[in-house]
Amino acid sequence: VLSGKGGVGKSFVTGAIATELARHGHKVGVLDADITGPSIPKMFGMSGRHVHALGNLMLPEISEHGVKVMSSNLLLQNETDPVLWRGPVIAGAIRQFWSETSWGPIDYLLVDMPPGTGDVALTVFQSLPVDGIVIVTSPQDLVSMIVAKAVNMAEKMNVPILGIVENMSYIECPDCGKKIEVFGKSKLPEVAERYNLDILGTLPINPALAEACDKGEVETALPDGMLPKAVSAVEAITPHETDEA
């Protein structure tokens, strides 16, 4: 799950898809590749928790509803400690999160990418068997250029794009239910047509849900059936179970 820029809610979309897949009975893991700005553990109620070892392997933390998570924040003594690592160290950590973690049998492993198309993205595409990409955007003027970068990267790495999700598309008036496009009219249909992408969903600004994520309650607060097209696109991929290790 990636975006060309920060602040579009990519981690929330990752968490939402993971939660819905788990509700469908799938075994799900989330590899948090946003090493310097991880938010997945907090979203899943793992603040203050740390990974443990099983021999030479790390054990991912498991959420209340069974989602397995591996993140740099789970390795730190305090979750507010900065991760002052250079690029090669970050790349090595991501490879370890994949190859030296005892994921057990899982159906789907979602990778929450950092913003942009730099070293981390290259490491993930070269080191992990990536079956598909979900692009996350917001309704802003730069969306076309940002999507173009993601599309070009996917083509160069020969990875299929499952589709695009637009977050923060609108806010619903609490009194009349009218949709207010606070960031302007969405350009998603035009961009999707230009790059031949499937639209996997548009999400509103939801302050209550954002607050629940900050409290680590995404699994209980997420409405049923959120992002059904995105979940179906992931489920259409033939699952590859990891080894028991």
Task: Locate each region found by the language model.
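Residue-level signature of catalytic and energy-coupling elements of molecular machines
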Residues: 6, 32, 40, 70, ...
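Glycine-rich phosphate-binding loops of nucleotide-dependent enzymes
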Residues: 70, 113, 126, 162, ...
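C-terminal lobe/tail of nucleotide-utilizing enzymes
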Residues: 151-245
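Walker A/P-loop phosphate-binding motif and the immediately C-terminal alpha-helix
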Residues: 1-32, 151
